[in-house]
C-alpha cells in the first residue's frame, strides 16, 4: 500500500504538466506510449479520478466508467493490447481547465474479446481535464474508419 502511494507520488511529480495546449499534446502522446507499453502506472496517472465516459469503437455504446483505482486500471488495460500512433492532433481549449482533442489512431489493436485488428484506424475525440497538476482523460470516443479512408487534418464543412 505504501509502495503504491510512493509510486503514484513519484509518477505524479514526473508527469506534472503546465496548463496549455503544448503540454496537453505531450500528455496525449505519453498516454498512448503508456497504453502501447501497458505501463499501468502511467495510464492510471492520466485517468480522471472522477470517472469517465467512453464511446466504444467495437460496439454502439457509451459506457460510464467509475472513478478508477490502480487495480481497475490493471484489470481493464491488461485485456487490451495496442500498437497505435496518434496523428493529425487538434487541440481546442473549451474553458480554463477543459480541452477537446481530435486525432486519429492507426496501427494494431487487440480488443478485450480477443479479436485482433492489424489495420486499426479510428477517429478519436477526447475531453481532458487539467486537475491535480496534470491532464486527466475524462471522455473517450473512438469511431472506426473504413479501410479506404486515411487520416487527414480537419477541414471546413463542405457547403455545396
Segments (PLM) and residue ranges:
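Sequence/structural signature of outer-membrane beta-barrel proteins
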Residues: 108-112, 146-147
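Generic short beta-strand segments
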Residues: 50, 103-110
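A solvent-exposed, acidic/Ser-Thr-rich amphipathic alpha-helical stretch
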Residues: 21-22, 39-94, 118
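Hydrophobic/aromatic beta-strand elements that line small-molecule binding cavities or substrate pockets
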Residues: 73, 86-92, 105-107, 123-129, ...
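Short, low-complexity N-terminal intrinsically disordered segments enriched in polar/charged residues
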Residues: 14-46, 155-160
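Sec-dependent N-terminal signal peptides
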Residues: 4-15
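Low-complexity, intrinsically disordered terminal/linker segments enriched in charged
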Residues: 11, 129-132, 136-160
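A short, structured loop/turn motif at beta-sheet edges
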Residues: 91-100, 128-135
Amino acid at each position: 500500500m505504501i509502495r503504491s502511494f510512493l509510486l503514484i507520488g513519484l509518477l505524479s511529480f514526473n508527469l506534472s504538466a503546465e496548463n496549455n495546449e503544448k503540454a496537453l499534446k505531450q500528455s496525449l502522446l505519453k498516454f498512448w506510449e503508456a497504453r502501447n507499453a501497458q505501463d499501468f502506472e502511467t495510464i492510471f496517472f492520466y485517468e480522471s479520478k472522477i470517472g469517465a465516459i467512453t464511446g466504444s469503437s467495437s460496439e454502439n455504446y457509451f459506457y460510464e466508467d467509475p472513478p478508477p483505482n490502480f487495480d481497475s486500471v490493471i484489470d481493464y488495460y491488461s485485456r487490451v493490447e495496442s500498437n497505435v500512433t496518434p496523428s493529425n492532433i487538434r487541440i481546442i481549449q473549451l474553458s480554463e481547465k477543459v480541452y477537446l482533442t481530435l486525432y486519429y489512431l492507426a496501427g494494431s489493436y487487440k480488443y478485450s474479446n480477443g479479436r485482433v485488428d492489424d489495420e486499426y484506424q479510428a477517429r478519436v475525440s477526447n475531453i481532458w481535464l487539467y486537475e491535480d497538476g496534470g491532464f486527466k482523460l475524462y471522455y473517450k470516443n473512438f469511431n472506426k474508419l473504413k479501410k479506404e479512408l486515411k487520416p487527414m487534418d480537419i477541414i471546413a464543412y463542405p457547403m455545396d
